[in-house]
Design a protein with these regions (language model features):
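Structural motif
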Residues: 4-16
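Short, acidic Ser/Thr/Gly-rich low-complexity loop/linker segments typical of extracellular
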Residues: 14-19, 24-43
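Short Pro-Gly-centered beta-turn/loop motif in secreted/extracellular proteins
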Residues: 39-49, 55
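Extracellular beta-sheet/turn segments enriched in Thr/Pro/Gly and aliphatic residues
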Residues: 66-83
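Aromatic-Pro/Gly-enriched surface loop or interdomain linker
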Residues: 104-133, 178-315
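Helical hinge/lid and interdomain linker segments adjacent to catalytic or ligand-binding clefts
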Residues: 134-149, 154-159, 164, 277-365, ...
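An acidic, glycine-rich "communication" segment
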Residues: 216, 220, 359-476
Length: 523
């Protein structure tokens, strides 16, 4: 018997016991996949129509070519589980724009558009959806590696973006109560405030493993065979996480935004003051929502944009006084970096960096739907502070701080270094006082300096002034800094910590400092 093909699911996990019907127009052969997901058989050379079915997955028809001579690379046939999923395309727009809602569900479902601001506020009911054909609400995924090209699902309904900008989610609930939610960033058609906030949409993509690849699992390409057991099959677990980012930049296949984001959901019953549950929500959109909710509650009007809006110029920085980036804005294009740098250092812009491990790695927008990550790790002890420095310019030259691995995976409060700085006005803090104790971050609890932290570096501008330091072990505390541009009046305030956003609603010190900086920068 020869290997004909492999069968795997949307995470590239091997599927055993899949019924496979091979039809060449003359004869029909019935085979089943092995525990490894491999399908073996004695098929004559030719082109076959293949029908696949297994309980818990949508049935599908594909094509397989069996060559006459010599070994051939076996096809990878992909099935989609019956868990509901969906996305809006494109995933960002401006007020009045149109989004295509694309949903996969094995049963009828209800869609609601919700704006996640000070609270979760229903914008409108999009309706109940079903189809006349049997299981016509079930989608399929392409065969092979579709992470660079997207899934190409059929549209269920078109939705017009509301006039009020912000972080929106479409919430899906099936007839039996299964749920899924997916983000839609709605920017204003024209500025409505002096404060712009950037959603970290490139990071959302980097962590999206739908299809079996992200920038953290099978980062360069899918392996030759589907995964049976991740910890024994994948180099990430066998030899360490650094394996994912050891190949040269040109080895990494692109990643498409046009896929569902199972790791980036917000629950329909979730409130911004709820603890943030789970590994990924603590640093993706759910954590960013906590900062947006706090800003609205405090009366700081703002306009939300996707990172693509900064890259392509939809976000005109010169129409704003303040730009806020938060939580985990790790992946920027050089166009994004250069635009913000020039705005701060030449035209007086005020940048608030309320996150950690930011602007660490360069990405290239291949088109409106696809990113290529220049993700090869910098050699320890090398001449560059990080990947962005290697491929473009130093992160600390823009933010005043840069991510280092010290303190990674820990969280702690901050200790005040310079209580006389205006960022601490009205707090009553003295040198050595501690703040940033309370946190909603359940993955890494412990304080506002945490998860991943940034510190000053040789490329930090000379004006970079230290205000507070995280109390993380082994010198891993985040450094809060303020710097001023040499000309033009531009300023940067950086906290250097992913967990800051998860603390602002529940920790008075974090809230007071954030409020002081926003008021001063926006005035």
């Amino acid at each position: 018997m020869r290997l004909i093909c492999h069968v795997s699911d949307e995470r590239f996990a091997a599927l055993a016991d899949v019924a496979c019907e091979f039809d060449d127009g003359v004869t029909v052969t019935l085979l089943r996949s092995a525990p490894s997901g491999a399908v073996y058989g004695d098929l004559p050379a030719g082109r076959y129509r293949v029908t696949l079915a297994r309980d818990g997955f949508g049935a599908k028809r594909s094509e397989v070519v069996v060559p006459a001579d010599g070994p051939a690379e076996p096809a990878h046939l992909r099935l989609l589980s019956e868990r509901p999923a969906g996305y809006v395309w494109p995933k960002w727009t401006t007020s009045g724009g149109t989004g295509s809602v694309r949903v996969h569900s094995p049963e009828p479902y209800r869609l609601t558009l919700v704006r996640h601001g000070a609270e979760a506020e229903e914008v409108r009911l999009l309706g109940w959806f079903d189809e006349h054909g049997p299981r016509a609400t079930v989608q399929v995924t392409p065969d092979g590696d579709y992470t660079p090209s997207g899934v190409g699902w059929a549209q269920q309904v078109a939705v017009t973006a509301p006039e009020r900008a912000g972080l929106h989610y479409v919430h899906l609930e099936t007839e039996s109560g299964a749920r899924f939610s997916f983000p839609w960033v709605v920017a204003p058609a024209a500025p409505t405030s002096s404060i712009a906030v950037l959603a970290s949409t490139n990071s959302w993509l980097a962590y999206n493993n739908f299809g079996g690849r992200s920038n953290y699992i099978n980062a360069a390409e899918l392996p030759e065979r589907p995964i049976v057991h991740a910890r024994t099959d994948l180099d990430r677990y066998r030899t360490g996480t650094s394996t994912e980012h050891s190949p040269p930049d040109e080895r990494y296949r692109p990643l498409s935004f046009e896929r569902p984001e199972p790791l980036n959901q917000i629950g329909i019953d979730e409130h911004p003051t709820d603890p943030i549950r789970g590994r990924q929500p603590c640093h993706l959109a759910a954590a960013e929502w906590r900062l947006l909710a706090w800003m609205e509650r405090e009366g700081f009007a703002h306009d939300l944009y996707a990172e693509a809006h900064l890259h392509d110029g939809t976000l005109d920085l010169d129409r704003y006084r303040v730009l806020v980036i938060s939580t985990h804005p790790e992946y920027w294009s050089r166009q994004m970096y250069d635009a913000v740098y020039a705005w701060v250092h030449e035209r007086g812009g005020k940048l608030m960096y309320l996150g950690g491990n930011g602007v660490d790695c360069e990405v290239e927008f291949l088109d409106d739907a696809t990113l290529r990550f220049r993700t090869q790790d910098e050699e320890p002890g090398g001449p560059h502070e990080n990947r962005m420095h290697r491929s473009h310019r130093p992160t600390s030259g823009l933010l005043g701080v840069v991510f280092t691995h010290a303190g990674e995976g820990t969280a702690a409060p901050y200790r005040v270094v310079d209580p006389e700085h205006w960022a601490f006005a009205g707090t009553g803090f003295a040198a050595g006082d501690v703040f940033g104790v309370e946190s909603l971050h359940e993955r890494i609890p412990g304080g506002a300096s945490g998860h991943e932290t940034d510190k000053r570096a040789p490329s930090s501008p000379p004006s970079t002034h230290l205000l507070a330091t995280g109390m993380n072990p082994d010198g891993g505390g985040a450094e809060i800094v303020h710097l001023t541009a040499e000309s033009g009046g531009g300023e940067v305030f950086s906290v250097g910590s992913i967990t800051w956003s998860a603390c602002v609603l529940v920790d008075k010190g974090v809230a007071d400092v954030t409020r002081n900086v926003l008021r001063r920068f926006a005035s």
